[in-house]
């Protein structure tokens, strides 16, 4: 790793306070361009790369069937790196100064229906054993708190408070927030805690959610869990933890919650981020409007 890249890594970790997952994503993208530049142009120093070299990389990515979304993410990583070099006066102008992101299709995240969520939870209404108790709790936490997948995975045992029905999570950029729990979910937390103490081996004791082998969960484990349960009740293409978080927000809005409250629960820094969840509640709003307005023919 070059000195500038190491300094950039330190900057992301210490100043921007990005998670290890995010930092690695940035570095992987930059290393990918570095490898391309070395192979294509015999140039190991990407600090002084020009836009022509970067454009060649973009063409290569597209030719290798990388989606526009994937290419744009890589360009965002590279742009952040050159912005850092500008800030530290390593370069005078960014080679990506006039770069425009590739166009991407707008895809709506379709939430689960209330019935689909109820149907999944009814499958494990009376969970038996550690894994079923854990799985039901994870599904219910996503649906009743809007917790992010990373927040759930990194939830510490010491941040679970069943006496006042709250959990403390560490969100993006290490921002803490307190999430309220429904009493029924607090009861599940206690039940899971009892099952958890019965594990023969606990390696990652600091973390609340574990595998049956006592290890901390990972991203793919949680994704597979949600996808597996919801595949039995839903034909939607995407069945992920994020869709369940999206469902949490949509169902709150459909049932009268105000946008600012939902924003706080989701841990968004701006209202604009929360507004993407409002499209799903428009159908409910339209229904109320059509039923209530006197000009609509009955």
Task: Give residue ranges: language-model regions.
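Conserved catalytic core of the tyrosine transesterase superfamily
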Residues: 1-298
């Amino acid at each position: 790793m070059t000195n500038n890249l190491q300094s950039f890594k330190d900057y992301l970790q210490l100043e921007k306070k990005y998670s290890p997952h995010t930092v690695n994503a940035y570095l992987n993208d930059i290393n990918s361009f570095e490898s391309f530049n070395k192979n294509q142009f015999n140039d190991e120093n990407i600090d002084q790369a020009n836009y022509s070299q970067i454009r060649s990389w973009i063409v290569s990515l597209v030719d290798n069937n990388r989606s526009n979304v994937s290419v744009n993410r890589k360009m965002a990583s590279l742009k952040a790196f050159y912005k850092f070099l500008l800030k530290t006066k390593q370069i005078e102008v960014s080679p990506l100064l006039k770069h425009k992101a590739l166009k991407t299709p707008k895809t709506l995240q379709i939430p689960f229906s209330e019935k689909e969520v109820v149907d999944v939870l009814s499958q494990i209404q009376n969970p038996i054993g550690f894994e079923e108790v854990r799985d039901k709790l994870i599904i219910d936490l996503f649906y009743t708190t809007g917790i992010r997948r990373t927040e759930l995975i990194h939830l510490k045992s010491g941040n679970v408070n069943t006496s006042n029905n709250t959990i403390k999570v560490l969100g993006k950029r290490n921002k803490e927030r307190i999430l309220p729990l429904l009493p029924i979910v607090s009861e599940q937390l206690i039940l899971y805690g009892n099952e958890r103490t019965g594990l023969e081996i606990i390696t990652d004791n600091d973390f609340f959610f574990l595998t049956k082998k006592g290890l901390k969960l990972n991203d793919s484990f949680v994704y597979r869990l949600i996808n597996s349960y919801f595949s039995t009740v839903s034909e939607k293409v995407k069945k992920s933890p994020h869709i369940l978080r999206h469902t949490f927000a949509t169902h709150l809005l459909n049932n009268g919650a105000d946008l600012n409250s939902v924003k706080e629960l989701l841990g968004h820094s701006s209202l604009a981020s929360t507004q993407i969840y409002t499209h799903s509640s428009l159908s409910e709003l339209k229904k109320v409007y059509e039923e209530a307005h006197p000009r609509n023919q009955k």
